[in-house]
């Protein structure tokens, strides 16, 4: 049995703009989550071509310990809280698989994303068979809704309801911003359709851990896209060449950060 949810994130930017914004924000967010022996290590970041699909392949290792809840820490063997993330970014489609060497086939997280130029109204964009699609829970994430943000995660300078872009004049996003966006031909629009499939096979803990991970994915997607929008003035003028250069610099910086200082960024303490 697996748990599947589809998260839909609408944004006031174009699919083309988002490609740069997403990569910029991933690099920045990685630095905020790395330090004190924990965080993200980039092993590979290179172009790939397979079965007619072209894109960028990344292989990252997530070193976690304090970032998981106590009930997981208590049962996890020493050194087991290390996760491998492999991603194939054939934009506007992207596929990410997270695995753990200790749990082998008993655990995976699969995130498949389609980026579409609409307001999140398309059904079954991932082309699942009808029986599987019936079991999928659809979750709408509103980046301007503060009630969807954990109190510990809230930052006023990363709040789309308060932020206005100097370069694009987009924002602040009011309570009816999606309706206004639908009626505004001058402002681009898009939706990230993120299909998350989770398998965790461990007797007595399966549904607790699967639900915990889905809750964390929603938290990550919410915080990440709030940041992405509020950082728009930092990335809107960048090219893909700028991004690749920045990724190379970030890879070196992450190695330094991980080996020094204190643990940084998101903790699962509030979810225990």
UniProtKB/Swiss-Prot annotation:
It catalyses: a 1,2-diacyl-sn-glycero-3-phosphocholine(in) = a 1,2-diacyl-sn-glycero-3-phosphocholine(out); a 1,2-diacyl-sn-glycero-3-phospho-(1D-myo-inositol)(in) = a 1,2-diacyl-sn-glycero-3-phospho-(1D-myo-inositol)(out); an N-(acyl)-sphingosylphosphocholine(in) = an N-(acyl)-sphingosylphosphocholine(out). The keyword Transport applies. The keyword rRNA-binding does not apply. GO terms for molecular function: phosphatidylcholine binding; phosphatidylcholine transporter activity; phosphatidylinositol binding; phosphatidylinositol transfer activity; sphingomyelin transfer activity. Signal peptide: none annotated. It holds the Pfam family IP_trans. This is Phosphatidylinositol transfer protein beta isoform.
């Amino acid at each position: 049995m697996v748990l599947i949810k589809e998260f839909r994130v609408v944004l006031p930017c174009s699919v083309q703009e988002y490609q740069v914004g997403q990569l910029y924000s991933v690099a920045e967010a990685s630095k905020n989550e790395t330090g004190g022996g924990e965080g993200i290590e980039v092993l590979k970041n290179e172009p790939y071509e397979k079965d007619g699909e072209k894109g960028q392949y990344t292989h990252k290792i997530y070193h976690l310990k304090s970032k998981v809840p106590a009930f997981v820490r208590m049962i996890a063997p020493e050194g087991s809280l290390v996760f491998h993330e492999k991603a194939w970014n054939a934009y506007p489609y992207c596929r990410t698989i997270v695995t753990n060497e200790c749990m082998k086939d008993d655990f995976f997280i699969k995130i498949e994303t389609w980026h579409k130029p609409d307001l999140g109204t398309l059904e079954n964009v991932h082309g699942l068979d009808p029986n599987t699609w019936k079991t999928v829970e659809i979750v709408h994430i509103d980046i301007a809704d503060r009630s969807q943000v954990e109190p510990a995660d809230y930052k006023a300078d990363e709040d789309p309801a308060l932020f206005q872009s100097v370069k694009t004049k987009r924002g602040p996003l009011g309570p009816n911003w999606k309706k206004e966006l639908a009626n505004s031909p001058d402002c681009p629009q898009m939706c990230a359709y993120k299909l998350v499939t989770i398998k965790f096979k461990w007797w007595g803990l399966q549904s607790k851990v699967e639900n915990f991970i889905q809750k964390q994915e929603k938290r990550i997607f919410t915080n990440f896209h709030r940041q992405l929008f509020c950082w728009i003035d930092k990335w809107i003028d960048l090219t893909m060449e700028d991004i690749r250069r920045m990724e190379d610099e970030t890879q070196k910086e992450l190695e330094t950060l991980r080996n020094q200082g204190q643990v940084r960024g998101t903790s699962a303490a509030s979810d225990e």
